């Protein structure tokens, strides 16, 4: 694809995406479903942006956009508020996440008539298990509910994003697309390394930023560090020693620690970074969802719509609720609170970026996938069902769960009356 064509497509996505996002704001609905539909219209329906060109652009826009969103989301999360809900968040991001992944994978294999142990289903489960801060944060800024409930779901979504990426990488090892000698060791090095390196860079940045007033230069400094984390963890280290760390998880950890440190120090540079991240996150959302819609070919929709719809419904109404109820057994939460958590897990940016990235990888490296997998399903069908299944999961979960968030909060949790002026969680 020519450079000027790519610039034209990006410009078109931004102009139309901004108009659509403004309409969504006026209608008081999340912009994600409208951006996805816009992508479908200018992609497969009107053929303005060819599917292959959309995929090419996504290879760059997806990973860079994820950095913006994870950094911005973690940067505004307060550790003091996180401490209040940490037990629930840890359960949701471990037990609930894993159960949701496994049940979604099981349903996927059942719908597509694959062996129950086939890694194809569990790859879909890993891609779609992460919930979405880009949907939840705007929803809870409008819905009056107990701040602890809102913070729990927002924190869960910020930290399960990198977990979704890590678990997808580990399962890709079974496809021969991610060098993996031992999935368990990979998981430990990817997550553990990310925490150590993310904290280390955050500490270095904290010292530099507090002692030198960077002002408008602070945002590129922090963003550049986040991009280098991704490069070092996901590319440089694995090529040198065979083991890396999850760059995305390191970005989230760095954002959380640095944002909190600068906020508590009342450092002027904090505001520069927040407004910069907000602007970039908006750009990333427009690119990721418009190009996800545009990536889809009409033939894909025709072939995979029914299985895609079934696995999406299974993921939203079976996998997530079972994951929440099993994950929170014996916790302090009432049945109604658990039900609210179960029905508020919209999927968004990370599943969108992962589905297309994984789809591209599978199609590019079809010859590397083991025969034990391809004798039941072709690489083209793997990529198609995962992309359409994820698309349907995002579309349905965001439309339904953002629409009923306020009504369910009122029905299940009752009207929230603050006892005193709550400290903002943003």
UniProtKB/Swiss-Prot annotation:
Organism of origin is Methanocaldococcus jannaschii (strain ATCC 43067 / DSM 2661 / JAL-1 / JCM 10045 / NBRC 100440) (Methanococcus jannaschii)
How this chain sits in the membrane, per its record, is:
Multi-pass membrane protein
| Effect upon mutating residue 132 to A | Loss of activity
Query: Mind telling me which residue stretches traverse the membrane in this protein?
Result: 1-21, 29-49, 57-77, 95-115, 120-140, 158-178, 184-204, 208-228, 236-256, 286-306, 309-329, 382-402
GO cellular component, alphabetical, reads:
plasma membrane
- Compartments, as annotated in UniProt: Cell membrane
Query: What GO MF terms are annotated?
Result: identical protein binding; potassium:proton antiporter activity
The entry assigns this protein to a family as follows: Belongs to the monovalent cation:proton antiporter 1 (CPA1) transporter (TC 2.A.36) family.
Is Translocase a UniProt keyword of this protein? no
Tell me what the record says results from residue 333 to R. No change in activity
Question: Domain of life, per the record?
Answer: Archaea
Query: Is Membrane there in the keyword field?
Result: yes
GO biological process: any one?
sodium ion transport
Query: What are the record keywords, sorted?
Result: Antiport, Cell membrane, Ion transport, Membrane, Sodium, Sodium transport, Transmembrane, Transmembrane helix, Transport
According to the record, how does pH govern the activity? Active at pH 7.0 and below.
Instruction: Please tell me, according to the UniProt entry, what happens when changing residue 347 to A.
Output: Strong decrease in activity
Q: Which PANTHER family does UniProt cross-reference here?
A: NA(+)/H(+) ANTIPORTER 1, NA(+)_H(+) ANTIPORTER 2-RELATED
Specify the protein name.
Answer: Na(+)/H(+) antiporter 1
Checking Gene3D superfamilies in the record gives:
1.20.1530.20
Cite the effect that the entry attributes to residue 156 to A: Almost no change in activity
By its UniProt entry, which Pfam families does this protein fall under? Na_H_Exchanger (PF00999)
Q: What is its main location?
A: membrane
Q: What lineage is on file?
A: Archaea, Methanobacteriati, Methanobacteriota, Methanomada group, Methanococci
UniProt function note: This is a Na(+)/H(+) antiporter. Can also transport lithium.
């Amino acid at each position: 694809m020519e450079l000027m064509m790519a610039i034209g497509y990006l410009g078109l996505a931004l102009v139309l995406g901004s108009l659509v996002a403004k309409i969504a704001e006026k209608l008081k609905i999340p912009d994600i479903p409208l951006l996805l539909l816009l992508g479908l219209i200018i992609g497969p329906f009107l053929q303005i942006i060819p599917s292959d060109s959309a995929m090419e652009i996504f290879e760059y826009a997806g990973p860079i956009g994820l950095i913006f969103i994870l950094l911005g989301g973690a940067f505004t999360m307060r550790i003091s508020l996180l401490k209040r809900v940490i037990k629930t968040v840890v359960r949701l991001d471990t037990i609930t996440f894993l159960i949701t992944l496994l049940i979604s994978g099981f349903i996927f294999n059942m719908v597509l008539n694959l062996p129950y142990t086939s890694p194809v289903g569990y790859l879909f489960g890993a891609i779609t298990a992460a919930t979405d801060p880009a949907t939840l944060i705007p929803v809870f800024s409008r819905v009056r509910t107990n701040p602890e409930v809102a913070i729990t779901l927002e924190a869960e979504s910020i930290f399960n994003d990198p977990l979704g990426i890590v678990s997808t990488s580990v399962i890709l090892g079974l496809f021969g697309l991610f060098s993996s000698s031992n999935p368990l060791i990979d998981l430990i090095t990817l997550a553990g390394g990310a925490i150590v390196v993310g904290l280390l860079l955050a500490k270095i940045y904290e010292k530099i930023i507090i002692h030198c007033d960077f002002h408008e230069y602070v945002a590129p400094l922090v963003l550049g560090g986040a991009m280098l984390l991704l490069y070092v963890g996901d590319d440089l280290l694995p090529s040198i020693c065979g083991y890396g760390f999850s760059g995305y998880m390191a970005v989230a950890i760095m954002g959380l620690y640095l944002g909190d440190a600068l906020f508590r120090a009342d450092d002027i540079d904090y505001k520069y970074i927040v407004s910069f991240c907000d602007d970039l996150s908006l750009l990333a959302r427009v690119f990721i969802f418009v190009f996800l819609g545009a990536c889809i070919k009409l033939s894909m929709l025709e072939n995979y719509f029914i299985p895609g719809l079934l696995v999406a419904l299974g993921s939203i109404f079976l996998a997530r609720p079972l994951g929440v109820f099993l994950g929170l057994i014996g916790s302090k939460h009432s049945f109604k609170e658990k039900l609210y958590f179960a029905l508020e897990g919209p999927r968004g940016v990370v599943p969108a970026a992962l589905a297309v990235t994984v789809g591209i990888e599978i199609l590019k490296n079809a010859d590397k996938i083991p025969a034990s997998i391809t004798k039941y399903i072709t690489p083209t069908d793997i990529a198609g069902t995962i992309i359409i299944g994820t698309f349907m999961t995002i579309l349905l979960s965001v439309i339904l769960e953002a629409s009923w968030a306020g009504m369910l909060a009122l029905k299940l949790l009752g009207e929230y009356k603050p006892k005193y002026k709550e400290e903002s969680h943003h």
